[in-house]
């Protein structure tokens, strides 16, 4: 029996409990009828119930899926702590091809597993999943967030995310140039999706000059036309050329891993401030940027606006309250910049220490959510 237990505790060549040592709970979800195979990871509920999206991806094996969900859920703990919201970190992954493996039955089965956690985990859309998928999950559980307005939710999260990027850019300008004005500066924006396009619009309104790149020609033409209406200038460049333009701030709003050994030598900017997730290819690249004299705004601080809206939705949607809370990104980022300089560490280290201090300051776990409680960022009535 002992030998059998020892054998069953292995995943790949690693002991499963060693692999999940930093996490509270891992739930393997298997429903043979619908074909569902999913993993829910709850990293830390010290600050509150776990919050994190559900992505669907054709992972090669369970090891790869587990590795991804462990990494992503831990990241959510720090994101929630950085945003100073009363939630912890969680994430879910569904193993499958989102183009051909989806079905109403699969998402209803997933909803049942989420419901079984009885409020320890709240989830919504992520890469490979849409709200149309979660309409089916909602038939089985109420622990779904990030809901469109027509379903009683708070709607498009790209609005507060973009606003958070603007506050982050203003804070960076204040730190570097002594004024938080956006005008008179040049920004290199990579990606004009839902967030990047809104950021570009606001920068143009402020009188900034832009270098932009995107894989879709129609959005490039659209923002070029906007510049004629709003002022400022827009220069369209090829994808690889965005790294080497002469600008004040690089604003990555598309893919992750773009700050790496190949791109850093090309950068001619004073700072990197954008909404893209996991911008650093490796943690050591924060040091490389630092050595080159380029200020880095940690991505999970910059893009916290969307997370703030998702968390706020659980108290009852309130756009004014969300934007008020999102404004705190300005102050938080300035604190991180100043602390990093004071301690002679990278901004990533400073941000992580700040988050860890927040978590350690909460001595007891708060694994369940109370809808009767007002958020601490509530607008005074």
UniProtKB/Swiss-Prot annotation:
Sites where the protein binds NAD(+): 55, 126, 157, 161, 191-197, 214-215, 254-255, 275-277
Gene3D superfamilies according to UniProt: Leucine Dehydrogenase, chain A, domain 1, NAD(P)-binding Rossmann-like Domain
Function: Catalyzes the reversible NAD(+)-dependent oxidative deamination of L-phenylalanine to phenylpyruvate.
Protein name: Phenylalanine dehydrogenase
Taxonomic lineage: Bacteria, Bacillati, Bacillota, Bacilli, Bacillales
Record organism: Lysinibacillus sphaericus
Binding site for L-phenylalanine: 79, 277
A GO biological process held by the record: L-phenylalanine biosynthetic process
EC number(s) recorded for this UniProt protein: 1.4.1.20
Catalytic activity of the protein: L-phenylalanine + NAD(+) + H2O = 3-phenylpyruvate + NH4(+) + NADH + H(+)
SUPFAM superfamilies, per database record: Aminoacid dehydrogenase-like, N-terminal domain (SSF53223), NAD(P)-binding Rossmann-fold domains (SSF51735)
UniProt keyword annotations, A-Z: NAD, Oxidoreductase
Gene coding for it: pdh
Metabolic or biological pathway, per its Swiss-Prot or TrEMBL entry: Amino-acid biosynthesis; L-phenylalanine biosynthesis; L-phenylalanine from phenylpyruvate (PDH route): step 1/1
């Amino acid at each position: 029996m002992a030998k059998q237990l020892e054998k069953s505790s292995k995943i790949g060549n690693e002991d499963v409990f060693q692999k999940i040592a930093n996490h509270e709970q891992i739930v393997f979800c298997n429903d043979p009828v619908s074909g569902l195979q999913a993993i829910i990871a709850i990293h830390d509920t010290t600050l509150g119930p776990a919050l994190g999206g559900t992505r669907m991806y054709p992972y090669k094996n369970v090891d790869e899926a587990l590795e991804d969900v462990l990494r992503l859920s831990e990241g959510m703990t720090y994101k929630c702590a950085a945003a100073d919201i009363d939630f912890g970190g969680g994430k879910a992954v569904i193993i499958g091809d989102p183009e051909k493996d989806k079905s109403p039955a699969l998402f209803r089965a997933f909803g049942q597993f989420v419901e079984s956690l009885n409020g320890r985990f709240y989830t919504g859309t992520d890469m490979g999943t849409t709200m149309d998928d979660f309409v089916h999950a909602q038939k089985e559980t109420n622990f779904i967030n990030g809901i469109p307005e027509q379903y009683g939710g708070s709607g498009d999260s790209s609005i507060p995310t973009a606003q958070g990027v603007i506050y982050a850019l203003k804070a960076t300008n204040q730190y570097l140039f002594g004024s938080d004005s956006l005008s008179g500066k040049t920004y290199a924006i990579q990606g004009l999706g839902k967030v990047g396009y809104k950021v570009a619009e606001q920068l143009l309104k402020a009188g900034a000059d832009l270098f932009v790149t995107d894989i879709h020609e129609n959005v490039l033409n659209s923002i070029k036309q906007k510049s004629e209406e709003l002022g400022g200038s827009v220069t369209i460049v090829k994808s690889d050329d965005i790294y080497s333009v002469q600008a004040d701030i690089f604003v990555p709003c598309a893919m992750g891993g773009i700050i790496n050994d190949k791109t850093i030598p090309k950068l001619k900017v004073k700072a990197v401030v954008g909404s893209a997730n996991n911008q650093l290819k490796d943690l050591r690249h924060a040091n490389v940027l630092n050595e080159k004299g380029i200020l880095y705004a940690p991505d999970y601080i910059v893009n916290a606006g969307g997370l703030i809206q998702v968390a706020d939705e659980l108290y009852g949607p309130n756009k004014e309250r969300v934007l008020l809370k999102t404004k705190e990104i300005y102050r938080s980022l300035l604190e991180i910049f100043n602390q990093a300089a004071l301690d002679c560490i990278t901004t990533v280290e400073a941000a992580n220490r700040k988050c860890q201090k927040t978590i350690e300051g909460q001595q007891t776990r708060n694994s369940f959510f109370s809808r009767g409680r007002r958020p601490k960022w509530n607008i005074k009535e």
